[in-house]
Design a protein with these regions (language model features):
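Membrane-embedded transmembrane alpha-helical bundles that form the catalytic cores
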Residues: 1-363, 367-413
Length: 414
């Protein structure tokens, strides 16, 4: 995986540093390389650490690694959980089929009516950020909607397809934009990557001998409180450096990972101070106002990281961040053109995007409050259920506005 994904990045930086001309190399990247590499590596480590029994049947192991729905963008399956239903015998179950179809439709609804519609807007602003410098902040907000709808929608389709076959896969999202901290966000966003990093990077690093020595040194130097927190902070920084590198071979992704790691590490160091400040300011942790403030604060911090994730370069990301706070011309949104016929991004397009985002928000809000949407829908008579399904299916081609590059999923490139 390292050879395929990072050779050209290393060669490019060597060429720039020493003024040579070694690359680039034109390597054919296998589909889903990162996902099945991590899945296989997790299995090998679980067997090595005696967490699971080795699979002696090579065909069953091949099925675990190459189960087709998850190849492109996960979720990253764990052997002990995925194989419980993957290797089991299955019988035809109409209710299970309907639930799978239901999940697939919801995934494509998010992908086609939110992600692909927002992509028109996002691509124009980020690709021509100097032209549309007055709506940079709207571009990153639209990207936050696009990325979530694209990735979570794709995973919904994957889980739905697996459900058709009676296979249960791990959930990969848990309403991440309702997170109250960056740490909480990463417990809700790309969950299977987070748990993989926790089990196979964070714990081995934080429990290593050199980290133990560093912890003892930190306690002597900074006291017990910071001495305990510093090793965890260093381990988190290493984890998110790896996360950034995993996302792509570019400095912007390394900055993206370090940014998240620094915030989480700093939060860990300041935990005691936060408690004291909240006590002095008489802040009630359980109050609705404080909860909403935490959600908004976290959402803004996450969106800062999206600048680096979506921009082509670090200077572009910094320029757009600057424009977001110094220059705002919302009227520029109506001048955006897309497609070969240079169509305009009309108020109708904007209304469709906002309404679909509102639907997704309401569903997520109800789920966050504990409402079982799918169970509630299953109690309705079949006419109502299928009327909803068909309405969503017909809405996709009629209301969706797809860019020339539409068709794939963003995380399939990783």
């Amino acid at each position: 995986m390292s050879v395929y994904k990072y050779t050209n990045f290393i060669v490019q930086n060597i060429d720039q540093l020493f003024h040579t001309d070694f690359g680039p190399f034109h390597l054919l990247l296998p589909i889903g390389l990162s996902f099945y590499t991590f899945q296989s590596a997790g299995y090998i480590l679980d067997v090595y650490w005696n967490r699971c029994e080795p699979e002696k049947n090579v065909f069953r192991f091949a099925l675990f690694v190459s189960f087709f729905p998850q190849i492109l963008q996960g979720p990253i399956g764990r052997f002990d959980r995925l194989t419980k239903t993957l290797y089991a015998e299955h019988e035809f179950d109409w209710q299970r089929i309907e639930r799978g179809v239901q999940r697939i439709i919801w995934g494509f609804f998010k992908k086609m009516l939110i992600a692909d519609t927002a992509a028109v807007f996002v691509d124009a602003i980020f690709n021509q950020y100097q032209t549309y410098n007055g709506i940079a902040i709207l571009g990153v907000l639209a990207y936050s909607a696009q990325l979530y709808a694209d990735f979570s929608g794709g995973v919904d389709v994957v889980i739905g397809v697996a459900e058709l076959f009676g296979v249960e896969m791990d959930e990969n999202f848990k309403r991440p934009y309702f997170a109250v901290s960056i740490t909480d966000f990463w417990h809700r966003w790309h969950i299977t990557l987070g748990t993989w990093m926790k089990d196979y990077v964070f714990y081995p690093v934080s429990l290593s001998g050199w980290m133990g020595k560093f912890g003892k040194f930190a306690k002597k130097k900074f006291g017990k409180t910071y001495g305990r927190a510093l090793p965890i902070c260093v381990a988190n920084l290493i984890v998110f450096l790896v996360v950034g590198i995993w996302h792509g071979a570019a400095w912007k992704f390394i900055v993206y990972g370090i940014y998240n790691g620094v915030i989480i590490a700093f939060s860990g160091l300041m935990t005691k101070n936060y408690r004291e400040w909240k006590k002095k300011l008489h802040i009630d942790d359980k109050s609705t106002g404080w909860h909403i403030f935490q959600i908004i604060r976290t959402f803004l911090l996450v969106n800062i990281s999206w600048y680096f994730d979506r921009a082509d370069t670090i200077p572009q990301a910094l320029t757009m961040m600057k424009n977001s706070v110094t220059h705002f011309e919302p009227a520029q949104i109506l001048n955006i053109q897309f497609g070969q016929m240079n169509l305009k991004y009309t108020p109708v397009f904007i209304a469709v995007l906002l309404v679909c985002c509102a639907i997704c928000f309401v569903v997520s809000f109800l789920q966050e409050r504990g409402t079982k949407i799918r169970q509630s829908l299953s109690t309705k008579i079949w006419v109502i259920r299928w009327a909803i399904y068909l309405a969503m299916i017909f809405a996709m081609p009629l209301l969706g506005r797809m860019p020339d590059t539409a068709g794939g999923f963003i995380y399939a490139q990783f």
